[in-house]
Amino acid sequence: MKDLFILSGPTAVGKTEISLNLAKALRGEVISSDSMQIYKHMDIGSAKIFEEERQGIPHHLIDVVEPWENFSVAEYKNIAENKIEEIYNRDNIPMLVGGTGLYINSIIYNYSFTDANKDNDYRDYLEKLAKEKGKEYIHSLLKDIDEYSYNNLHYNNLKRVIRALEVYKVTGKPMSQYAKEEKENLFNIPYSIYYFVLYMDRDKLYDKINMRVDRMLQEGLLDEVKELKEMGCNETMQSMQGIGYKELLYYLNGEISFNEAVYLIKKGSRNYAKRQLTWFRRDPRAIWINKDEFENDDAIVKEILNKFNKLKGF
C-alpha cells in the first residue's frame, strides 16, 4: 500500500511551518484538511497559507468554492482522493494537513457517502404508516426480520426503528449485522497511514489562540468580513458559520459590540481546540507529539521523521 501522511492538531498549535519542512524532507504535497480554507476570499480568518509562503511546496484544496456555496464532506473526500492519486502519479507523498477531523476521517476510514443503503420512498411510506397505525405497529414489523433491533429499540425511537427497517429492505441484512460489517471494514483503506497529532500545554495553547485572534484582527479580519457582507454573504451560509466570521457579522449587523465579538471569537476558538483534541484521541492510529518537549520546530520535524522511518522499517 502507498503512504499517506497526516499532520493534524488543534487550531493555533503551529502545524503550517512544520508541515512545510516535513514536505521538503518527504517530497510531499500538502492537501489541506481545513473546512474554512476551502472557501475563496476567506483568508485571514482561516489562517490560509498564501502562495508566496508555500516555499515551492504544492498545496491543494485551498480556494475551491465561493463563500456562498455549500461544500460537503462527501465532496471533500471525492476531490481529495483524486488529488492523492495525482500525487502518487508524480511519485510524491500526499500529506493531509489541517485540523478538521471529519475531513481527515473521510479519507482514513472506509466511510461511504453514497445513498446505496437508503430508500427515501420506503422511509416516507413507513412514516405515513406510523401516523395511521401507530409507532407500536411499525416497531412490530422488526420482529421477524431483525430480532436484535426489535428487542433493543423502543417503539418511541421511531427514527431508528424506521432506519432499521430501511436497511433490511435495501441490504437484506438486519441492522446489527450491517453495522458489524461496516465496523469491520472501517480500516479497510488503500493507504499506509502515518498520522501525527501536535499538541501542547493547554494554557499555552489558549494563550496562542488569544494572541492569534488579536493578530488576525490587526491584519484586517474585520475588513475581510465587511467585504464578504458586501458580496452578499450572510449568517445563513455555511461559510459564515466559521469562528471569527459569524461573530464579526453579528457585530456588523448591530447585534453585539465589537468587544463582545472579540470575546466570543476567542472563547469559540478555545472551545473548538478542546473539541478537536477530543476528536483526535478517538483514533488509535494517531501518534501524539508534545511540542513542549522540543526546543524548536526543527527538533519536532526531526522527531516526526525518525518515527516515520521507524514505522516504515528503515
From Swiss-Prot:
Its cofactor is Mg(2+). It comes from Clostridium tetani (strain Massachusetts / E88). ATP binds at residues 9-16. One of its GO terms (molecular function) is tRNA dimethylallyltransferase activity. The record marks 100, 123 as: Interaction with substrate tRNA. This is tRNA dimethylallyltransferase. GO terms for biological process: tRNA modification. Monomer. Catalyzes the transfer of a dimethylallyl group onto the adenine at position 37 in tRNAs that read codons beginning with uridine, leading to the formation of N6-(dimethylallyl)adenosine (i(6)A). Belongs to the IPP transferase family. Substrate binds at residues 11-16. Keywords: ATP-binding, Magnesium, Nucleotide-binding, Transferase, tRNA processing. Pfam families: IPPT. Its EC number is 2.5.1.75. Residues 34-37 are annotated as: Interaction with substrate tRNA. It comes from the Bacteria. The lineage of its organism: Bacteria, Bacillati, Bacillota, Clostridia, Eubacteriales. It catalyses: adenosine(37) in tRNA + dimethylallyl diphosphate = N(6)-dimethylallyladenosine(37) in tRNA + diphosphate.
